[in-house]
Design a protein with these regions (language model features):
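Bacterial Sec-dependent N-terminal signal peptides
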Residues: 3, 14-46
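The substrate-binding groove and active-site-proximal loops of carbohydrate-active enzymes
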Residues: 138-153, 189-205, 263-280, 309-320, ...
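Aromatic-lined carbohydrate-binding/catalytic grooves of carbohydrate-active enzymes
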Residues: 160, 164-206, 230-249, 260-278, ...
Length: 490
């Protein structure tokens, strides 16, 4: 994409910034270098001020509240979009406000700085601001996956504050549900205070509610996860019919299933997403969810290419085609709720995008799409599938084969730099951990403090410069001066 090299270089610079004063400019040592067409003010950085905002994104005209941990006398803040300064003001104390401009779908960067006696500007801290009335225009997706007794209100507030600092504007709730065919813990009329998820972990309904409420207070949206075609082994007792399943053969005797450990509740048996009765059934179960939990939409999942599968009558099932009618049925039942559907290894991607009913595109990439060149291929295809209107989020599980310890920081940052520069974003940040597995509660790898700091800077860059990275533009061929003999892997 145009500017990819410059965008990646800028992100690497952000990650390498330190608290040491690193003078740039030089020259006459006065209030700025003169000569040529413009005056240039020398600038240096001393990133010692930590900044936060009260929300992950704002509507045009909304009040943005900033907080700083400490400010020196004479500090000022400057607001700019790309290279255009919008306004600036003096700041004192630890908090101040700014009215978001009227222009919608725009990224801004706030620089807090002071001016030295020689005229050099010292940047003390920076933070991005996203002014967008619809979060799906520039989705920055995170997740939560644990809802046990440890998730107190204060703990949830702390976790969501970090996601807010990274401008995460949508959060996927993974492994929150009771059963795939009956997601709500309890009934519409009577919720269970505690229930078991598929792995027999405790799920506290109040924790789920608290996550949603606190996310909304930060301006985030909450999306519940579920398969489009999953049922547990007790589904018949909950009204799921045998005729709704898909089978490995034409004789409707061997149900297709996703096998799970014996210690878990059940294997997951697969239904026909295109079956109208199943669609009506699960849409009603979703209605029970929406009636009790203030979710903003449904993150639909699938399991990729299953090979030849058959319905109860022995007809071959075209799964990508059934995804279309499933999405349309879900939107028809809840037109005001958002929908996103996973394209596992791009399976069904064109059909999903072609519905016109999903709000952005979501690709879970696996070994057959593990090169950086594959990310470009996916984004280019999605751009066509979505009529140049839908953004792409990648679910790419980092350091997948590493058993314990910390994430490989250079690998994380390189992957993010490539994804962001291409115009995508990366589902990787959770409330309490970074994602390393398709089983989202897996916490075997930890983020170092250095990685946490770098990630904040990367997400500031993606947000502040979203109009450069993710808002159209033309593709331009770039000649690389570096030859890589082997593909670069995620």
């Amino acid at each position: 994409m145009k500017y990819i090299i410059y965008a990646m270089a800028a992100m690497f610079f952000l990650a390498s910034c330190s608290k040491d004063n690193d003078e740039t400019g030089g020259g006459n040592g006065g209030g700025g270098e003169t000569g040529g067409v413009t005056d240039v003010t020398p600038v240096t950085s001393d990133l010692t001020v930590n900044l936060t905002t009260d929300k992950a994104c704002y509507k045009p005209g909304e009040t943005v509240s900033f907080t700083a941990d400490a400010l020196p006398a004479g500090a000022k803040v400057r607001y700019r979009t790309l290279n255009k300064v919008i306004s600036e003001q003096a700041v004192a104390g630890s908090s101040w406000t700014w009215t978001a401009p009227a222009t919608d779908f725009t990224g801004y960067l706030a620089d807090v700085y002071r001016t030295k006696e020689d005229g050099t500007e010292v940047i003390l801290g920076t933070i991005a601001v996203d002014v967008s009335s619809d979060w799906t225009r520039f989705p920055r997706y995170g997740f939560v996956a644990t809802f046990d007794a440890s998730k107190t209100e204060s703990k949830i507030q702390e976790e969501m504050a970090f996601l807010n600092r990274c401008h995460i504007n949508g959060v996927q709730f993974q492994d929150w549900h009771n059963k795939h065919h009956w997601p709500l813990g309890g009934t519409r009329e009577h919720l269970d205070a505690v229930y078991k998820d598929i792995a027999n972990r405790d799920i506290y309904t109040q924790s789920v509610k608290d996550y949603i409420r606190i996310q909304h207070s930060f301006g985030m949206k909450a999306m519940f996860y579920n398969l489009c075609f999953g049922a547990l082994d007790d589904a018949a007792g909950d009204g799921v019919k045998e005729e709704w399943y898909i089978f490995k053969g034409t004789g409707h005797t061997d149900k297709d299933a996703h096998t799970l450990p014996d210690s878990w509740k059940s294997n997951i048996y697969l239904l026909d997403p295109g079956n109208a009765e199943w669609q009506a059934y699960i849409a009603q179960r979703n209605d029970d969810v929406y009636a009790n939990l203030d979710f903003d939409g449904y993150q639909i999942d699938q399991l990729g290419n299953r090979g030849d599968r058959y319905d109860y009558k022995g007809n071959k099932v075209n799964l990508p085609k059934t995804y279309v009618s499933f999405i349309e049925a879900m939107k028809g039942k809840h037109p005001d709720k958002r929908l996103v559907m996973n394209a596992v290894s791009s399976y069904g991607a064109s059909q999903i995008a072609g519905t016109g009913k999903v709000d952005f595109l979501y690709n879970e990439v696996w070994g057959d799409e593990a090169d950086f060149t594959d990310l470009y291929t996916i984004l280019k295809a999605n751009h066509q599938y979505g009529n140049q209107a839908l953004k792409t989020v990648f679910a790419a599980y980092m350091n997948y084969e590493k058993g314990s310890g910390e994430f490989n920081m250079p690998g994380i940052l390189l992957t993010d730099a490539v994804m962001f520069a291409l115009g995508g974003s990366h589902l990787e940040l959770g409330g309490d951990h970074m994602l390393c597995s398709e089983y989202f509660p897996n916490t075997r790898l930890q983020m170092s403090d250095a990685l946490k700091t770098a990630v904040v800077r990367y997400y500031d860059f993606m947000t502040a410069y979203q109009n450069l990275l993710r808002d159209g533009g033309e593709e331009e061929k770039v000649l690389s001066l570096i030859h890589i003999s082997e593909p670069t892997r995620l």
